[in-house]
UniProtKB/Swiss-Prot annotation:
Residues 105-124 are annotated as: Disordered. One of its GO terms (biological process) is translation. It comes from Micrococcus luteus (Micrococcus lysodeikticus). Belongs to the universal ribosomal protein uS12 family. With S4 and S5 plays an important role in translational accuracy. Interacts with and stabilizes bases of the 16S rRNA that are involved in tRNA selection in the A site and with the mRNA backbone. Located at the interface of the 30S and 50S subunits, it traverses the body of the 30S subunit contacting proteins on the other side and probably holding the rRNA structure together. The combined cluster of proteins S8, S12 and S17 appears to hold together the shoulder and platform of the 30S subunit. This is Small ribosomal subunit protein uS12. The gene is rpsL. CDD domains: Ribosomal_S12. The modification 3-methylthioaspartic acid is found at residue 89. Keywords: Methylation, Ribonucleoprotein, Ribosomal protein, RNA-binding, rRNA-binding, tRNA-binding. GO terms for molecular function: rRNA binding; structural constituent of ribosome; tRNA binding.
Length: 124
């Protein structure tokens, strides 16, 4: 424990807080260009074919982002909006692509949680 005199001389250093989405650089979302769109498999107890994309963000940082929802229209050179939020069973995937924004279409025939997937309300 330092003495008061030592604290007067030196002071305390603030704790360094690590962010979960460093590539976003403090922004809620960032725009980027898909460099590769592919599928991958999740870690052990789960089994599926998950759709992911390598995205080069505007700052020049390249990240792996998950494409949520059923079906997508993304390909190389598509311009996408990337938000934070990891996918627990895909190692290294710490970002998600926003559906219904820029070149990404919303999910077709989506009834519930529509705003998350950029789906319009169905006409009766």
């Amino acid at each position: 424990m330092p003495t008061i005199q030592q604290l007067v001389r030196k002071g305390r250093s603030p704790k360094v807080v690590n962010t979960n989405g460093p590539a976003l650089q403090g922004n809620p979302m960032r725009r980027g260009v898909c460099t590769r769109v592919y599928t991958t498999t999740p870690t052990k107890p789960n089994s599926a074919v998950r759709k992911v994309a390598r995205v080069r963000l505007n700052g020049g940082i390249e990240v792996t982002a998950y494409i949520p929802g059923e079906g997508h229209n993304l390909q190389e050179h598509s311009i996408v909006l990337v938000r934070g939020g990891r996918v627990k069973d895909l190692p290294g995937v710490r970002y998600k692509i926003v559906r219904g924004a820029l070149d990404t279409q919303g999910v077709k025939n989506r009834g519930q949680a529509r705003s998350r997937y950029g789906a319009k309300k169905e006409k009766k």
